[in-house]
Amino acid sequence: PSFATPGFDVVGCGLNMVDQLVMVSEYPKPDSKQQITRMEYSPGGQVATAMVTCSRLGLRASYIGRFGDDVHGKWGLESLSEEGVDTDACLTAEDTPNGFSIILVDRERGTRTILWSRPPALDLAPSDIQPSLVCAGRVLLVDCHDTEASTTAARCARAAGIPTLIDVEYVRPGIEDLLAQIDIIITSEGFPFELTGCESAGRSLRAIRDAYKPAMVCMTLGKEGSLALVGDAEIRTQGFRVPVVDTTGSGDVFRGGFIAGWIHGGNSTSAADVLRYANAAAALKCRKLGARQAIPTSREIDTLLRA
């Protein structure tokens, strides 16, 4: 894109959460008792964590989302401000607890299982979307949780000539209309198969490209990196080997790293280089427990890329 210079580099519209992370030596069996080896609380949520990543990587980031008015909601909102993310566009639901997750982390495998709760009063509606706010950046990131609101936001951005990205995990009602408004589709590993019914990764990405006409469609592959399709070109980017403590939030950091690598690199940067930058950011995040504790700096990413 030909990036303009509005108030922010990136605006993110979507989910925030607060996580309680519970580490155990191995995943508990049914009807068993398991000692907790470590426990922490951390702010999280897909888009909120991606905006923190962008801010740590030197971008001017704004977050649009709704918080509860309990202690978790207040903490989640404050955590963004402390990270330099603008929260002037945020909303609060009265007498409503914030979105909350309990995350079981298997210490031996580095894997996690998420149990979550998000009251419907926290949902964003299309009427919550103000064009002047979602179009205040050079790039817009949305997720797939409140599909109608995300579709409205993406339409506003596209009408203003602002590139749109999505972090999409699940097939939900309205997802087709949403994807049709997106320029860069970044999916979880399973989403392309669920959406298209195709049995191979490459074929499923091509089906998404043909149906929704994005400039890029990419699936994250965990420790194996990512697979992207730009036009007819497949770009497979290897993951980075780092000591893994917890993968919570790694996909969110991948999206934030992608946006930062794209904006910092400008039009001269190749898609492969942007994807390597995003993979490095996501890998380094896994060094600590929690979605945001180990989000890397630009220097840490550059060091890993040169290694």
PLM regions: where:
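A glycine-rich helix N-cap at a beta->alpha junction
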Residues: 79-95
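Gly/Ala-rich phosphate-binding loop of Rossmann-like dinucleotide-binding domains
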Residues: 55, 158, 263
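Short gly/ser/thr-rich secondary-structure transition/capping motifs
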Residues: 84, 119-125, 164-170
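Conserved phosphate/ATP/ADP-binding segment of small-molecule kinases
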Residues: 151-236
